[in-house]
Amino acid sequence: MASRGKSETIKLRQNLEEQLDRLMQQLQDLEECREELDGDEYEETKKETLEQLSEFNDSLKKIMSGNMTLIDELGGMQLAIQAAISQAFKTPEVIRMFAKKQPGQLRTRLAELDRDLMVGKLGRDLYTQQKGEILIALQKLGEKLSPEDEAFLSENAGAVFNQFQKVSEGLGSGDKVLALASIEVENTRK
């Protein structure tokens, strides 16, 4: 008992991160295989995955209400789940890196996007969407953006930024996070 639950907390956090990774990978795989699936199959699979995310979010709410030592660590995961549920972010890979607070990997992905656009491997619309998501995630993680990135965000990321702002408003209060999560889950179920 000397650890006062520290090892259990670490194990729980690890299990939660693995489950979040699995769900985000499932969303990413679904998007990558979209062309191979018929419309109904795609929609049904996406709906099931979003339901699993909602259930995971409900579990996080229960854990957060009963174990205050995990609130800070789980808050980031919950925000990422809310962003996925509300579809503020369309790229599961970005959601995963944001949830794990990995600004270095987000910046690497940003460089890959720039390269892919230059060689013609990526269309302008998809580039704009993904770059906007990454820049917003970096900003929310407290990272400093270059003046060029700030300008890109102000020009292109209005809708994504507004949705994400809605999801992350009032994050200072655990009660507000839980209330917002409940609203997002209910909206998803409708």
Swiss-Prot record:
SUPFAM superfamilies: beta-catenin-interacting protein ICAT (SSF81730)
Family membership noted in the UniProt record: Belongs to the CTNNBIP1 family.
Ribosomal protein found in the keyword field: no
Protein name: Protein LZIC
Coiled coil: 3-63
One MF term in the entry's GO annotations: beta-catenin binding
Cystine residue pairs: none
One family name in Pfam for this protein: ICAT
Originating organism: Xenopus tropicalis
Keyword list, A-Z: Coiled coil
Gene symbol of the encoding locus: lzic
